[in-house]
Design a protein with these regions (language model features):
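A short, charged, amphipathic alpha-helix used as a generic interaction element across diverse proteins
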Residues: 27-48
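Short, mixed-charge low-complexity intrinsically disordered segments
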Residues: 41-80
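Intrinsically disordered, low-complexity boundary segments flanking structured domains
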Residues: 11-12, 37-39, 56
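Beta-strand-rich interaction surfaces with strong enrichment in secreted/lumenal proteins
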Residues: 23-25
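Short aromatic-glycine-(Arg/Gly/Cys) micro-motifs in beta-strand/loop hairpins
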Residues: 1-21
């Protein structure tokens, strides 16, 4: 079993009155994901952002649940 942990930052924006997740950005570490998520929210003006990790086993196609590292601003219910 080969498990790979991915660290991701993802922006969230208001679209037609509801919050929607944007394009996820892969990051090299948990700290980088948190820093990128904070920048997406604070500097680039997204409604919110989230940093999370996910462990995946590509050999069997198993995607484990996301582990939220940090949230900024408004995010989708999936990341609360």
């Amino acid at each position: 079993m080969t498990e790979i942990t991915s660290f991701v930052a993802m922006p969230c924006d208001f679209i037609d009155g509801s919050i929607a997740a944007g394009e996820p950005i892969d990051c090299p570490s948990p700290a980088a994901a948190i820093q990128r998520a904070q920048g997406l929210w604070k500097i680039f003006g997204h409604a919110g952002s989230v940093a999370f990790s996910r462990t995946t086993d590509f050999e069997i196609g198993k995607f484990n649940d996301k582990h939220v590292l940090c949230r900024f601003g408004h995010v989708t219910d999936e990341y609360r």
